[in-house]
Each structure stands twice: as C-alpha cells, then as structure tokens.
Swiss-Prot record:
Protein name: Angiopoietin-1 receptor
Main location: membrane
Domain Fibronectin type-III intervals: 447-541, 545-636, 641-735
Effect of substituting R915C: Found in a patient with solitary sporadic venous malformations; increased ligand-independent autophosphorylation
Keyword set includes Lipoprotein: no
Pfam families in alphabetical order: fn3, Ig_Tie2_1, PK_Tyr_Ser-Thr
PTM section of the record: Proteolytic processing leads to the shedding of the extracellular domain (soluble TIE-2 alias sTIE-2). Autophosphorylated on tyrosine residues in response to ligand binding. Autophosphorylation occurs in trans, i.e. one subunit of the dimeric receptor phosphorylates tyrosine residues on the other subunit. Autophosphorylation occurs in a sequential manner, where Tyr-992 in the kinase activation loop is phosphorylated first, followed by autophosphorylation at Tyr-1108 and at additional tyrosine residues. ANGPT1-induced phosphorylation is impaired during hypoxia, due to increased expression of ANGPT2. Phosphorylation is important for interaction with GRB14, PIK3R1 and PTPN11.
Effect of A925S: In VMCM; increased ligand-independent autophosphorylation and kinase activation
Cysteines paired by S-S bonds: C44-C102, C211-C220, C224-C233, C227-C240, C242-C251, C255-C264, C268-C274, C280-C287, C289-C298, C302-C311, C315-C323, C317-C329, C331-C340, C370-C424
Domain of life the protein comes from: Eukaryota
Positions bearing Phosphotyrosine: Y860, Y992, Y1102, Y1108
Species, as recorded: Homo sapiens
Glycosylation positions in this chain: N140, N158, N399, N438, N464, N560, N596, N649, N691
InterPro entries for the chain: EGF-like_dom (IPR000742), FN3_dom (IPR003961), FN3_sf (IPR036116), Ig-like_dom (IPR007110), Ig-like_dom_sf (IPR036179), Ig-like_fold (IPR013783), Kinase-like_dom_sf (IPR011009), LE_dom (IPR002049)
C-alpha cells in the first residue's frame, strides 16, 4: 500500500495558561484495517514544519493487553521529509491483529491517536472501526456475524470479558447496548466465538465525549461552534476537528480533490486518490474514510446523492445544483452554503501575503506582522503566530483594510534561543492557511574592553575607543562614544565616531569623567549594551575658588557674601566673579569684584526669596567655580503662625509640643508661652528656642491635674506671628496615698508593715549578694572604661540628642521621633553582642501597632560604644526613608539609656540566611532529589545584590560612608527585600579619616582604609565587592584560612578573592572592578546597579546553584569573621 498513510502534525490547540497555547494536530492513516494476505502499513507524517520532539508508533497495550509483544520496525518514510511508518509483509499477517497508537509531543504535552487492525477472516466484523458519542447518549455497538459456528459468542472490553450469548441465540447482528453512555464506557470492544482467539476477533472502539452534545469546557458550560460536514467539537477547546477533505473554522470549506490535512496541503497520490485509506484523528473524532468513500476498508464509493466521510452526508442542493461525492453541492457563482441556500459573494480561502521567508532581528522587543487576504476577511481571533517551541501567540493589535487583515504580535524580549521556524496561521470559515518563515535572532554587540585615554587637557581628551574585540553579532553599523561627569546627575552625552581615535572637546576643567563605547548593528533595536567604563580627570586651569565663602542675609533686599583674602601665586591681575541666581525666578546676575576685596553686597533683591550664589577667581583664564551656596533674603512681613501644632506624651508634670514652620520668612526663633488657665497674663512663662530648625520641645515642671493655656509664636526680623487661638493642655493626676487611715485599720497596717520589713530584709540580703558578684565584673571592666562617668557620651532632651565629640563647635542636636516608654512591649531577644542587645517588640506609633527591633546598649558599654550607637540614630534621622535601608521608627530615652526602634526584619541577617540555604548540609536528601545546592535561585541572589547596591547608591547620594558593609549587616525583610543596617560606624562626610583605635572589619576593608585609615564611598564599593562574593558563595568567609597579617601583605601585591566555582565570569568581573587598587577607578553604586539590573533582565543563570559532581561550598571560619 502507498506510504502516504500518515500522521500529520497540524493544529488542535491544547489550552495552556494565559494567552499562550501549545498547538498540534494528528492524523493517523490506517491502510487496510482488515488484514488479509496483502501488505498493510501505518505511516506517520509531520507536515508543515519540523516538530521539536519525534513522533512514535507503538502497540496500544492499554487498550489490548493480550496482543503480540514483538517490537515494531519503525522506519523513515523516504517519500516525505518528516514521516515514520510501519510495514507488515504478507508472511507476518498472523502478528498484525491488535491495537496501535501514534503519539506526538509539543512542549511536553502528548497527543495520542489510536486505531486497530484485525483479520478479514474474523468470525465477526464491526459495523465501524470507531464510534463517537456524547455523554448521555444511548449507544448500540454492533458486530456483523460472518461465520456461523455452534459456539457461544463472547464480547470483551479492553481485553476483559463483559458479555456472552448462548450458541443457539447468536443473532446475525451482535449488539451491546449502553443506555446513557458515560466517559468510563469508552474503550476497545471485541467479539468472537468462545473457541476463538485474538486472531479471529473483531474490534471496534467507542469514544465518549466528556460533555453532553454541543457543549465544551472544564465545566461543560460553553456552547460548541456549529461543526459542519460531520466535524466533531473538541470538549477541551471548543474547536472543530474537521474530517479528512474539509477545513476551516467550521469545517464548511471542502478541500481540492484527493487532498487532506488542516490546510489541505497533503495529497493522496494513489491512482484512485484516497481509496483504501482509513484516517484517524485525535479524540473525540476517531477514524473514518476520506470524503467520498465508505466501508471498513474505505474502498466503496458513495451512492449518488451522498458525500463526505463514510458517505454519511446527503446532498440537498438548491437551484438544481450538482452533488459531488467528495465536495457536496457545487454552488453556482453568487450562491453559497452546504445546500447553496444563501446568496452572497463566494467565500475565498485566506492567503498570507508580504511575509518574507527569512527575517533577521536583534534581541529585545520584537513586533512581527501577519497580513492576510480572503473572504470574509480574517478576524483578530482567527490569526495566530506559532513559535518554534509550539507556543501560540495572539495579536496584541489588529487592523484591516478593504482587502487585507493585519495582525500585529508583541514579543517583549526575543532571545537567540527563539531562533527557528515560526508559523503565521489563519483559520476562517472559508478555510485555513499557514505560512512558515525563519527568524534568526542576533546577539547585540558589546565591546570587551574599556576605551583608553591617550591624552587630556583642561577641556579635551584624546580617546582610543577600543571597539574591537566585541561580544555578540556583527556587522557593526555605527559606534557611539558615551561620556558624562562622574559626580553630576546628568544624562549620558554621546558622539558618533567612525575612527578608533577620537577627540572629545568642550570638557570642564578639573572634572572627573566616565566614558564607554556603544556598538550598533544593523536592524531595528540594534543598539548594544554599553561596554566597560573608563574614568579620567581633565587638567586644572585658572585659580581655585575663594576659600571660606559665607553667604548671609543683610536686609530684605541684600545678601552679604564674604571670603578669605586671596593671595595668587602669579602676578597677573585677578578679580572675583560672583554669579547670583534666584531659585524661584529666572533671574541671574554676574558681578565682578576687585581681587583685593573680601566681600560683596548683593543688592536689589526681592524679600523672602531664595538665591543661589557661587564664585570663582579669574585671571586671563577663568578659574574654578565654588560649590553653590544658598540663602534667603529677610522677610518683609510678619512670619506665619507655626502649623501642625500637636501636644503629646502628656504626664503629670510634662508634655511634648511639636510644630512645623514655612521656609522663606527668616524665622529666627520660636517662643512657647504657657500659663495656668485663669491666671493673669503677666503670670505666663516664656520658653525661647533660638534654633528654628528644632520642631519639638518638652515642657517640664508642670503641676499635676492642671489646665494650661499654651501659645506658640514665630519671630523674624519684622516681629512675632499672631496666634489664631490658644491650645489647652491638661496634665494628668499624680497618684497619691490615702490621706487618713481609720484607727480600726491600724492593727492591719502593723501586721502588713512587719511582714513587709521581713520581705525587705530578705530582698536586701539578696541584692547585697548580687552586688558582690557583679563587683568582680565591674573591676574587670574598670580599666577599659574608667572614664565612662566623667562626661556623658550622649545627652538627651525631649526628642533631641547631642553627642559630646570634643570639638570646639558642637553641631545642632539631632531631632528624632519620640516613642513613649509605655508604648513598647518587649518580646524576645533576637541578637546580642559584647556591648549591645537587639530585642523584638511590639510598639505603638501614630496609633498603630507594629513589630519593631529595639536596639539598646548593655551596662558595660564604653563611651565610644555609646557614641557610635547614638551616631547610628543621628545617621538614620538624617538619611530619611528608603526601601533598601533599615528605617527608623522612633527612639525612647529611659533612665539615662537610649532605646532605638527600627524596622523588624523577619528573616534575620543576610549572612545567616545564605548559610541556611546550603541545603546539601541541612537536608542532603532534598538537595540530591532536586539536584540543587541552595534553596535560593540565581535570580533571588542577584536581587539581594541589587537591593544592597540601590541602598548604597542612596547613601552615597546623601554623602554617607557606611564603613562596615558586609552580609552580617544586611537584613532580609518582608518579601525577601534586602535592607542595609548597622549604621553605627557611618559618617556623613565625603572623606573620613579614622583617628581612634577600634575593632576593624579587616576582611571587608579597602587597601587605602587598611593602610591610611581613610574611608570614602569608593572604599564602601570595595566592601560591596566582598559582600557580593559572600552572596555568590552562599555565605562563605572571605579569605578563609588567611590571617589578617597575610592580608596586609598580599592585597597591595595584587592578590584578590578567588572566583567561586558557581560564579559567572560577568559577576566576578564586577567584583574585580570593585577591588581595583585606585579608588577612583572603581565603579559607582549607580553603575553597579545598572549592571545588576541588566543581568536580572537577561534571565541568565549568573549564579549556578545546580548540584554538580564533587560540589563543595566555600569555607566558613566564624573566628576569622570577628572584627580585628
């Protein structure tokens, strides 16, 4: 038999999640299901495009267990590109009887088609090879008696006996009746005489749809499309499975003569077309003849007036139209429909136009377009795009003209693995068409090396862009050189370059720049990622700016700018240029001041306006501008009344008053006036606060249970504000003992007093013993902390904190949000060190209850420890809120000790979190079963790194240096967000030089910090590189096995932490950039964050947590992690 008998991969959709589906159609053609002495075969054909997984043919032991066990000889059909077949020669006829399947897979989903073969000389023959019914139908399964024997007839289902008929009652038509068929009734039914065997059995297969007639869906509550020409509605998708010889969304369109398949592209090449081919499709269709043929062997032509598969359809053509046994009614022009019953434009099979065979695209966003004609025009739902892995995409945008429909699809990020054959598919009532095309996805180019700086001047630089070698695909269409000042928040500028050597002009003198190269390949979206960054500094020119610049208001229209005397090194004439501009208005003025002066009055200004001023010293060349100074002119009106006045934390003798003031009114002080209600005006008390930045104050020494009248004023150069109304303050009552005790109670008091004295004596003895024990500890601590009580390290006053730093001019005290001691409910100790403790607590803040972590110092903490602890509060107050730092909730002073409330991180510190993820150590069975070394993915680890970089970028913008950046000082909060913590060593200045001895985190410190005790944001970048190493190594100890002395020796010689085995080169390269010896060559935190965000977008495994052979974790040495 011709090898055309085939399995065709076409398109029944298997619904997956969202808007993506996996699509596959199967057709199995069984040549001569009734086996005689002739050759018979099964052939599978994959049409259209190559499936990702091979198709298979095998024996269906699920349907029939007791069939032959011999393996099938499956070969490639050489007549077609993608086809498999099994051929049985005549001499193997005895081994053919049984059930078979053909299976195909797309994206792991399997579609299986079943069929049977039986002997033509069987005692019974089935009425049909398969029978498809709906749930609830009444079913009669029929077998025709061919041979007469004096034996009982028996019927089996899937090889198991279910029914028998006595020998004298065996009818000519043997039937099995199934009232109200259910899905469990489906299966292979066989009939034979009791003395027969598999060789003499007849088979038929019953298919029961999961839903009732014309219904589909998981709950069978959707109405099926009207499937014509004996098409069957699929109970999972609602789509019509069209019989061989018909196509389209409703199976109305007839194929050309002797063609079949979803798009009618396959052809029966026999002399009589599709005669003797039994076509089997995926359930619930089953098997049938091609259109125009009938009979078990599909070798009988339809009688006149009938057409379609198995000739079950009757022609009822209107207007005297002819009936064709293959296509049905042949309608004249102007008429359409199954019976030519409708007038209208003749339907036209859709065609896909203007789609090239090959498309080259760049990785990134991609918007392919499918354009099709036909009548009726295809709709949005009828056009799809199939990816090489079988994913079906639906249009994101759609439009049509008079002759064409255009579907626009969106792939947000196409990558090289998406290269391959894509298919545009159109399926309408007029037919179906598919057009495969090849997409080649190119990798965007990126230079491997940073550009080199050949020469620099004060306003130019000569650059070798080093565009080759590069990573990715060419050819290169153009090249861009990107550059910008390092410390300015400006967008990157760029110039197009054609040569390798280029000159950058119009640069600012004595400015640090960073630059990189971006390559562009042909095609839309061809701009690659910028390459490595190079930094350089332009030369100086002119004189430095004046020193000691100070800007103060003089009057309502005058500001006074002063500076120290200038002594230029050259004899050239010089002058001071002052630039003044208004913040509120577009008003700018430049003033020239003789070089021998040390001040200038800026006149003709506007009252209550903020100005920005800068200055430089010019000779023949222009000097460098100073930093911007800002000041307000004095006010011309009375200041507005303080706003948001609140009275809180009221006790029997004190209360806290808070307020806010508006900028721009030259407010110099705040006055709080209070008196007992009802007393004379001259009996008030005035509290004058000369620091206008203070916004809260605690009134003390108030009388219990007393009503006070409180007024608050703002004062400026004009006068005091006028309060709109007074505020009432009522203190709480003081708890008192009863004033008089009756004589009858004296005896009771005496008894209780005696018992109390006894208890007091016992308690006193216990305290003395406890004090003696503690005395030993205090003596041990005395030498280290003998000066603790000489001068308090921290002073508190009603929401303000002052640090005694032993400098001539102490800065203004720090103002912090106050928590009431009674609003803190302590729970568990969650962390403890030598001199500090962290407790979990529930606090009440702004009326809301929340979890918090409370930090406090122990009794033996030194003055430096107290100062660092208070410094942490100072830092947190100045930093403000950010999602990637542990934020301050409030603070409380109780009995001379400071209690600091910060966000509670439920997952603890990052170091412990990483080490707990080492599942090979904690749960080896789980690790081996899942082939993983960590419970954390590459994406999660990179998210931790990006969170820390984002927080450190914020700190660097605020000009804060952390000085102790390590995984142990990162906390993991809600939703696994990493937050920077432990600001005890932080400093709010650009460069900090440590002058005192203390514990040092040597393994995380930069070279310049180890050698010179200098700390900058660049030294924090070094520490970040070590933290990144900790993340990748899942909590390993840096330089494990090395002493601190060895580090002091080896780091200046170029030694660095080795690359972890599970680390991608790109991540390790980022670490190495952080460990560059010259601080100014290290990347900024903003650049680090850009690199990490790009890695997260790539979705590549940058940190491999897969369990491979001989896997080992990085070493851990807890003793080495203690600060030196």
């Amino acid at each position: 038999m011709d090898s055309l008998a085939s399995l065709v991969l076409c398109g029944v959709s298997l619904l997956l999640s969202g808007t993506v589906e996996g699509a596959m159609d199967l057709i199995l053609i069984n040549s001569l299901p009734l086996v005689s002495d002739a050759e018979t075969s099964l052939t599978c054909i994959a049409s259209g495009w190559r499936p990702h997984e091979p198709i298979t043919i095998g024996r269906d032991f699920e349907a029939l267990m007791n069939q032959h066990q011999d393996p099938l000889e499956v070969t490639q059909d050489v007549t077609r590109e993608w086809a498999k077949k099994v051929v049985w020669k005549r001499e193997k006829a005895s081994k053919i009887n049984g059930a078979y399947f053909c299976e195909g897979r797309v994206r792991g989903e399997a579609i299986r088609i079943r069929t049977m073969k039986m002997r033509q000389q069987a005692s019974f023959l089935p009425a049909t090879l398969t029978m498809t019914v709906d749930k609830g139908d009444n079913v009669n399964i029929s077998f025709k008696k061919v041979l007469i024997k004096e034996e009982d007839a028996v019927i089996y289902k899937n090889g198991s006996f279910i029914h028998s008929v006595p020998r004298h009652e065996v009818p000519d038509i043997l039937e099995v009746h199934l009232p109200h068929a259910q899905p469990q009734d489906a299966g292979v039914y066989s009939a034979r005489y009791i003395g027969g065997n598999l060789f003499t059995s007849a088979f038929t297969r019953l298919i029961v749809r999961r839903c009732e007639a014309q219904k589909w869906g998981p709950e069978c509550n959707h109405l099926c499309t009207a499937c014509m020409n004996n098409g069957v509605c699929h109970e999972d998708t609602g789509e019509c499975i069209c019989p061989p010889g018909f196509m389209g969304r409703t199976c109305e369109k007839a194929c050309e003569l002797h063609t079949f398949g979803r798009t009618c592209k396959e052809r029966c090449s026999g002399q009589e077309g599709c005669k003797s081919y039994v076509f089997c499709l995926p359930d619930p269709y089953g098997c049938s003849c091609a259109t125009g043929w009938k009979g078990l062997q599909c070798n009988e032509a339809c009688h006149p007036g009938f057409y379609g598969p198995d000739c079950k359809l009757r022609c009822s053509c209107n207007n005297g139209e002819m009936c064709d046994r293959f296509q049905g009614c042949l309608c004249s022009p102007g008429w359409q429909g199954l019976q030519c019953e409708r007038e209208g434009i003749q339907r036209m099979t859709p065609k896909i136009v203007d789609l090239p065979d090959h498309i080259e695209v760049n990785s990134g966003k991609f918007n392919p377009i499918c354009k099709a004609s036909g009548w009726p025009l295809p709709t949005n739902e009828e056009m799809t795009l199939v990816k090489p892995d079988g994913t079906v995409l639906h249009p994101k945008d759609f439009n049509h003209t008079d002759h064409f429909s255009v579907a626009i699809f969106t792939i947000h990020r196409i990558l090289p693995p998406d290269s391959g054959v894509w298919v545009c598919s159109v399926n309408t009532v007029a037919g179906m068409v598919e057009k495969p095309f090849n997409i080649s996805v190119k990798v965007l180019p990126k230079p491997l090396n940073a550009p080199n700086v050949i020469d620099t001047g004060h306003n130019f630089a000569v650059i070798n862009i080093s565009s080759e070698p590069y990573f990715g695909d060419g050819p290169i269409k153009s090249k861009k050189l990107l550059y910008k000042p390092v410390n300015h928040y400006e967008a990157w500028q760029h110039i197009q370059v054609t040569n390798e050597i280029v000159t950058l002009n119009y640069l600012e003198p004595r400015t640090e720049y960073e630059l990189c190269v971006q390559l562009v390949r042909r095609g839309e979206g061809g701009e690659g990622h910028p390459g490595p960054v190079r930094r350089f500094t332009t030369a100086s020119i002119g004189l430095p700016p004046p020193r000691g610049l100070n800007l103060l208001p003089k009057s309502q229209t005058t500001l006074n700018l002063t500076w120290q005397p200038i002594f230029p090194s050259s004899e050239d004439d010089f002058y001071v240029e002052v630039e003044r501009r208004s913040v509120q208005k577009s008003d700018q003025q430049n003033i020239k001041v003789p070089g021998n002066l040390t001040s200038v009055l800026l006149n003709n200004l506007h009252p209550r306006e903020q100005y920005v001023v800068r200055a430089r010293v010019n000779t023949k060349a222009q000097g460098e501008w100073s930093e911007d100074l800002t000041a307000w002119t004095l006010s011309d009106i009375l200041p507005p009344q303080p706003e948001n006045i609140k009275i809180s934390n009221i006790t029997h003798s004190s209360a806290v008053i808070s307020w806010t003031i508006l900028d721009g009114y030259s407010i110099s002080s705040i006055t709080i006036r209070y008196k007992v209600q009802g007393k004379n005006e001259d009996q008030h008390v005035d509290v004058k606060i000369k620091n206008a930045t203070i916004t809260q104050y605690q009134l003390k020494g108030l009388e219990p249970e007393t009503a006070y009248q409180v007024d608050i004023f703002a004062e400026n150069n004009i006068g005091s504000s006028n309060p709109a109304f007074s505020h009432e303050l009522v203190t709480l009552p003081e708890s008192q003992a009863p004033a008089d005790l009756g004589g009858g109670k004296m005896l009771l008091i005496a008894i209780l007093g005696s018992a109390g004295m006894t208890c007091l004596t016992v308690l006193l003895a216990f305290l003395i013993i406890l004090q003696l024990k503690r005395a030993n500890v205090q003596r041990r601590m005395a030498q280290a902390f003998q000066n603790v009580r000489e001068e308090p390290a921290v002073q508190f006053n009603s929401g303000t904190l002052a640090l005694n730093r032993k400098v001539k001019n102490n800065p203004d005290p720090t103002i912090y949000p106050v928590l009431d001691w009674n609003d803190i409910k302590f729970q568990d100790v969650i962390g403890e060190g030598n001199f500090g403790q962290v407790l979990k607590a529930r606090i009440k803040k702004d009326g809301l209850r929340m979890d918090a972590a409370i930090k406090r110092m122990k009794e033996y903490a030194s003055k430096d420890d107290h100062r660092d602890f208070a410094g942490e509060l100072e830092v947190l107050c100045k930093l403000g809120h950010h999602p990637n730092i542990i934020n301050l909730l409030g603070a409380c002073e109780h009995r001379g000790y400071l209690y600091l409330a910060i966000e509670y991180a439920p997952h603890g510190n990052l170091l412990d979190f990483l080490r707990k993820s080492r599942v090979l150590e904690t749960d080896p069975a789980f690790a081996i079963a899942n082939s993983t070394a960590s419970t954390l993915s590459s994406q999660q680890l990179l998210h931790f790194a990006a969170d820390v970089a984002r927080g450190m970028d914020y700190l660097s913008q605020k000009q804060f240096i952390h000085r102790d950046l390590a995984a142990r000082n990162i906390l993991v909060g809600e939703n696994y967000v990493a937050k920077i913590a432990d600001f005890g060593l932080s400093r709010g200045q650009e460069v900090y030089v440590k002058k005192t001895m203390g514990r040092l985190p040597v393994r995380w410190m930069a070279i310049e910090s180890l050698n010179y005790s200098v700390y900058t944001t660049n030294s924090d970048v070094w520490s970040y590189g070590v933290l990144l190493w900790e993340i990748v190594s899942l909590g390993g100890t840096p330089y494990c096995g090395m002493t601190c002395a060895e580090l002091y020796e080896k780091l200046p010689q170029g030694y660095r932490l080795e690359k972890p085995l599970n680390c991608d080169d790109e991540v390790y390269d980022l670490m190495r950039q952080c460990w560059r010896e010259k601080p100014y060559e290290r990347p900024s935190f903003a650049q680090i964050l850009v690199s990490l965000n790009r890695m997260l977008e790539e979705r590549k495994t940058y940190v491999n947590t897969t369990l491979y052979e001989k896997f080992t974790y990085a070493g851990i040495d807890c003793s080495a992690e203690e600060a030196a």
